[in-house]
């Protein structure tokens, strides 16, 4: 969880670099996506654990999403505005 928290500050700065004209909209979309994930993830975790009985499986999914996010971050180009 510490590594996840280390991304919060830098990822909030990304919209300012990529979309300076629409930084409010981009930040709002990021915040909305985070809120939706915060609502859905406990429900999804519960369903997965109930169906499989495996407590590790939901965490593997979380790690997979984090790795996908890391991979996609390499394609962000702050030197090119949208």
Curated annotation (Swiss-Prot):
Is Cell membrane found in the keyword set? yes
Give any Gene Ontology cellular component.
Answer: plasma membrane
The membrane topology of this protein is: Multi-pass membrane protein
Q: Please state where this protein is localized.
A: Cell membrane
The protein's superkingdom reads Bacteria
Annotated Gene Ontology MF terms? transmembrane transporter activity
Q: Where are the transmembrane segments?
A: 29-49, 55-75
Q: Which UniProt keywords apply?
A: Cell membrane, Membrane, Transmembrane, Transmembrane helix
One Pfam family hit: MFS_1
Q: What is this protein called?
A: Putative uncharacterized protein YjhE
Q: Which organism is it from?
A: Escherichia coli (strain K12)
